């Protein structure tokens, strides 16, 4: 029987899984692109889609529901002030999962999960330095 097979357990307890996806969702909202393992990325996608749908609603109840799922208020603020209006016209499909090879240490399949129509300037400091160096080489 296929009872209780609705999601990946990822060898973690319920509390650990909930914290993991709250942290990953916050990182994705902050940086708009993260690299993780393929099963985690596939499991994170519906969580983020639901958060963006809440942000599109934009009312107080939706904000409190999002705050219950995310760990930091700055992620909730960014979700409702930047990402919600950005995807107001799009009916779903806010993130994409791209396969990114295999991790060196254990050959785990890796993936990049990113927002569609993302802001390339929202990346972290290391990525900004790398992209600046690439642009300097091109000129």
Swiss-Prot record:
Q: Which UniProt key words apply to this protein?
A: Ribonucleoprotein, Ribosomal protein
What are the GO BP annotations of this UniProt entry? translation
Q: Which GO terms describe its cellular component?
A: cytosolic large ribosomal subunit
Q: From the Swiss-Prot or TrEMBL record, what is one GO molecular function term?
A: structural constituent of ribosome
The family this protein is said to belong to:
Belongs to the bacterial ribosomal protein bL17 family.
Q: Quaternary form?
A: Part of the 50S ribosomal subunit. Contacts protein L32.
Matches recorded under NCBIfam families:
L17
Q: What is this protein called?
A: Large ribosomal subunit protein bL17
Organism listed in the record = Cereibacter sphaeroides (strain ATCC 17023 / DSM 158 / JCM 6121 / CCUG 31486 / LMG 2827 / NBRC 12203 / NCIMB 8253 / ATH 2.4.1.)
């Amino acid at each position: 029987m296929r009872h209780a097979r609705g999601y990946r357990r990822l060898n973690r307890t319920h509390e650990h899984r909930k914290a993991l996806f709250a942290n990953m969702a916050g990182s994705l909202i902050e940086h708009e692109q993260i690299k993780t393992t393929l099963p985690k990325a596939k499991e994170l996608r519906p969580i983020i889609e639901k958060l963006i749908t809440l942000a599109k609603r934009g009312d107080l109840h939706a904000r409190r529901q999002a705050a219950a799922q995310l760990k930091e208020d700055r992620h909730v603020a960014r979700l409702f002030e930047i990402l919600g209006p950005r995807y107001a016209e799009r009916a779903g499909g806010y993130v994409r999962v791209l396969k990114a090879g295999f991790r060196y240490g254990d050959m785990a399949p890796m993936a990049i999960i990113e927002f569609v129509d993302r802001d390339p300037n929202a990346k972290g400091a290391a990525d900004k330095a790398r992209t600046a160096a690439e642009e300097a080489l091109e000129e």
